[in-house]
From Swiss-Prot:
EC number: 6.1.1.19
BP GO terms, sorted: arginyl-tRNA aminoacylation
UniProt-listed PROSITE patterns: AA_TRNA_LIGASE_I
Motif 'HIGH' region positions after renumbering to this chain: 131-141
Disulfide bonds: none
A single GO molecular function term of this UniProt record: ATP binding
SUBUNIT field: Monomer.
Record protein name field: Arginine--tRNA ligase
Catalysis performed (reactions): tRNA(Arg) + L-arginine + ATP = L-arginyl-tRNA(Arg) + AMP + diphosphate
Family, as annotated: Belongs to the class-I aminoacyl-tRNA synthetase family.
GO cellular component: cytoplasm
Length: 580
């Protein structure tokens, strides 16, 4: 269904024929031959680099290869012209029937149009959000949640078997801090005046936890030493925070398949098993690391520690996994967690971290490479910071959270759909200034409005056509005479529809769902342009009062656009608007 793949296959077959005829030497590798849209649409519909990449290994001039390939391609009825440009690029123009055929396939496939078998059912684990269970999700978590969820949906659309996973960081010191903070709110619920020391969590959201602790335990823990209440309060508060986090995720339409507890790794032999696996490969040793330059990391000490030879798998330095006092480092449970992922049989792992975890990437990749003997790739995506603006001012704090803007604040301000789309209009590793006022503007400068308005405009046109007695059911539109679509503006839209399967595969191959948002904006722009041309040219109007056949063809084109927009928005986790 990917037209660009079809034409690339034609190019490869033509090169193979040239080889058989002696026009090219034997043994050439065609893997780097591409077929893509040209940078300038005036140059044609597609362009191939075949002559440029084959010239050196073939020991031939690129133009000679390009001219011979052009003659071969011109024999195919789908190619109306093949022109050599510059040093040896080949620009192709396709017969109009090709674009019309693509529209027919889109109409018949409906929202399955663009789905790919690229993933071949390979199992992918996408871990995202994984926020500490110490409070509500903030705007940084929101970006990670949106990015991870859209990426998971994209990979599913591209034929992968995807598991969405959240790692609960409930095994470290931060949940002890949560417990102590919740205990203070518990005392407050009993009427005591409390002060929050530095390092505790002062947010008002813990008042609910304090009240719930009072309801469950009464005054049992009042005035008692920490060792009598820490574990129970910690477990209770962590569970309540995870309930809050699940509610926050639900506001964005994010549903996880797996919630994996860090705590489950301790005392179960899982950390030991992971390190034994590395030890069996000669990758664990006792030693003292050289002191690092600059700021010393938390896990460095000038004594003998248990170390992982991560440098043998691409890391800059070897990493401690057990301290000199026998305690695990932060890295040890992370190794065990990824060992568990590898053991579950995933073919590919994707971790989505905040930008502040950039220094963790190499060691994590080294661990997965070592644990899987290089068979399971790990891709780590970093999400840069988001700054919120409202009324021209940076929006910095939530009263309930105390120190940060929450996910709930953002969704309350602009809605889940707008939040999701807007956060996907920038690549994940770029900082993003999110203007809440502009996100609600009804203008071309607001991408989510512009795309949604295109879809709503199409549905409005179809409704009005039905009300006027014009048949525009799926069967009628699928059977429309698409050969009537010959205007440049119509063909520009058709070409964009044809590019959709290619965009899906590129976005999935690079793990970049923002490409989908960009593409939808471009498609919407072409649709709006065609609509406005119809105001002055009757033949381009979606409803052409002079020709029922032209009306059906135009409505079929519009319907194909709606199919792509709906599928694309579905990948982004945004509900397509049918009216605005």
């Amino acid at each position: 269904m990917n037209l660009f793949t079809d034409i690339r296959t034609l190019v490869i077959d033509s090169l193979a024929a040239m080889t058989a005829e002696g026009a090219l030497p034997e043994g050439l590798d065609f893997a780097n031959v591409t077929v893509e849209p040209p940078r300038d649409a005036a140059h044609g519909d597609m362009a191939t680099n075949a002559a440029m990449v084959l010239a050196k290994p073939a020991k031939m001039k690129p133009r000679d290869i390009a001219e011979a390939l052009a003659a071969k391609l011109a024999q195919d009825k789908r190619i109306t012209s093949a022109e050599v440009a510059g040093p040896g690029f080949l620009n192709l123009r396709l017969d109009l029937s090709v674009w019309q055929d693509v529209l027919g396939k889109a109409l018949n496939a409906e929202e399955a149009y663009g789905r790919s078998d690229m993933g071949q059912g390979k199992r992918v684990n996408v871990e995202y959000v994984s926020a500490n269970p110490t409070g509500p999700l903030h705007v940084g978590h929101t970006r990670g949640a949106v990015f991870g969820d859209a990426l998971a949906s994209l990979l599913d659309f591209a034929g992968y078997d995807v598991t969405r996973e959240y790692y609960i960081n409930d095994g470290g010191a931060q949940v002890d801090v949560l417990a102590r903070s919740a205990y203070l709110r518990y005392l407050e619920a009993h009427g005591q005046s409390v002060e929050f020391p530095d390092g505790t969590y002062p947010g008002e959201y813990l008042k609910d936890v304090g009240a719930a602790l009072k309801d469950k335990f009464g005054d049992r823990f009042v005035g008692q030493p920490e060792e009598t209440w820490l574990e129970e309060v910690r477990n209770f508060a962590t569970d309540m925070m995870m309930d809050l986090i699940r509610e926050d995720l639900a506001l964005l339409g994010v549903e996880m398949d797996v919630f994996y507890s860090e705590k489950s790794l301790y005392g179960t032999g899982r950390i030991e098993a992971a390190l034994e696996s590395l030890d069996a490969k000669g990758l664990i040793y006792e030693g003292v690391l050289e002191p690092p330059k600059g700021k010393k990391p938390d896990d460095w000490e000038p004594r003998i520690q248990t170390l992982f030879k991560s440098t043998e798998h691409g890391d800059d330095v070897d990493r401690p996994v057990k301290k000199s006092d026998g305690a695990w480092t932060y890295f040890a449970p992370d190794i065990a967690y990824h060992y568990d992922k590898v053991s579950r049989g995933f073919d590919m792992l994707i971790d989505i971290f905040g930008a502040d975890h950039g220094g963790y990437v190499k060691r994590m990749k080294a661990a997965v490479s070592a644990l899987s003997d290089g068979k399971v790739p790990l891709d780590v995506k970093l999400c840069q910071l988001v700054k919120l603006f409202k009324d021209g001012q940076e929006f910095k704090m939530s009263k309930r959270a105390g120190t940060f803007v929450t996910l709930r604040d953002v969704v309350d301000a602009v809605g889940a759909d707008v939040t999701r789309f807007m956060l996907l209009t920038r690549k994940n590793d770029q900082g993003f200034d999110f203007d809440l006022d502009k996100a609600l503007e009804q203008s071309k400068d607001n991408p989510v409005f512009y795309v949604q308005y295109a879809n709503a405009r199409i549905h409005s046109t179809l409704r009005k056509a039905r009300e006027a007695g014009i048949a525009c059911d799926e069967a009628t539109l699928s059977g429309a005479d698409l050969s009537l679509l010959t205007h440049d503006a119509q063909l520009a839209v058709a070409r964009k529809v044809a590019e959709w399967p290619r965009q899906v595969e590129i976005a999935a191959r690079t793990n970049e769902p923002h490409r989908i948002a960009f593409f939808l904006y471009e498609l919407a722009s072409d649709l709006h342009g065609l609509y406005h041309l119809g105001k002055s040219e009757e033949s381009l109007r979606f409803v052409n009062e002079s020709s029922e056949l032209a009306t059906h063809a135009n409505l079929a084109l519009a319907r194909a656009v709606s199919i792509v927009i709906s599928a694309g928005l579905g990948i982004l986790g945004v509900k397509p608007a049918q009216e605005m």
